[in-house]
């Protein structure tokens, strides 16, 4: 497995006690498949994503990314692991208003130390992969909501991660644009063999997913299992 979250428990301070966000959660995510994690608000989906991204250290359990047990890594090593192996697609694209689509990607990968010309080629290749080859020199205000989210996805892939973590990518999009973004994520996951986790509360497009896991009250209530076929 490219990503393994094993028996993870995560708590937060809550007055005089602790609030359990994740309770002994185990999730294995294979390369080349898109695993959807669904559930209501407060079920633990975002906490699971934060732990998988190594942004939060769990109270107990293990997180293994690309064969590396993150509990054994220093803060600097975790930062390098995130940069090299983990791509994160946030709910809101948060693009820089002054930069073109291509520049958004190049800025994020600048710390890799690769030559600028190589970064430019990589950015253009990814924009082509997400259907925005003709938008490389456009700024965010010149792009639709769906196009901005596509830039967001391309940006997360700049460093060729083995793990892709996606947080509610369709929440601000209409049904048609949301379906197009999810189709794109499925295609990119298979073409690039990433282990992709998609967190969502939207059940409308589950038939596009490879596997689905259901969260409730900080636990995996079901899954991951092959995604159901959704009528209509």
Where are these regions (language model features)?
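ABC ATPase NBD coupling module
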Residues: 16-19, 70-87
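Helix-to-loop junction immediately C-terminal to a conserved catalytic motif
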Residues: 53
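Conserved ABC transporter NBD signature motif
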Residues: 61-69
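Short coil-to-helix segment of the ABC ATPase nucleotide-binding domain corresponding to the Q-loop/switch region
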Residues: 99-108
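Conserved ABC ATPase signature
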Residues: 139-143, 147-149
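Conserved catalytic motifs of ABC-family nucleotide-binding domains
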Residues: 160
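Catalytic Walker B motif of ABC-type/P-loop ATPase nucleotide-binding domains
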Residues: 164-167
């Amino acid at each position: 497995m490219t990503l393994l979250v094993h028996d993870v428990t995560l708590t937060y301070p809550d007055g005089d006690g602790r609030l359990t966000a994740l309770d002994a959660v185990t999730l294995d995510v294979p390369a080349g498949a898109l695993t959807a994690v669904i559930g209501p608000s407060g079920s633990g989906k975002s906490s699971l994503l934060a732990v998988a991204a190594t942004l939060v250290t769990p109270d107990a359990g293990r997180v293994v990314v690309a064969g590396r047990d993150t509990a054994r890594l220093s803060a600097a090593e975790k930062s390098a692991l995130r940069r090299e192996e983990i791509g994160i697609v946030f709910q809101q694209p948060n693009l820089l208003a002054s930069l073109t689509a291509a520049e958004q990607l190049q800025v994020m990968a600048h710390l890799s130390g690769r030559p600028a010309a190589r970064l430019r080629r990589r950015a253009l290749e990814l924009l082509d992969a997400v259907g925005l080859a003709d938008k490389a020199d456009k700024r965010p205000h010149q792009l639709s909501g769906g196009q901005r989210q596509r830039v967001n996805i391309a940006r997360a892939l700049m460093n060729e991660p083995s793990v892709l973590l996606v947080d509610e990518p369709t929440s601000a999009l209409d049904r048609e644009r949301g379906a197009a973004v999810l189709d794109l994520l499925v295609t990119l996951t298979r073409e690039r063999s990433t282990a992709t986790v998609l967190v969502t509360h939207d059940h409308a497009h589950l038939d596009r997913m490879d596997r689905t896991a259901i969260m409730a009250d900080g636990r995996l209530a079901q899954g991951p299992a092959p995604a159901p076929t959704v009528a209509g």
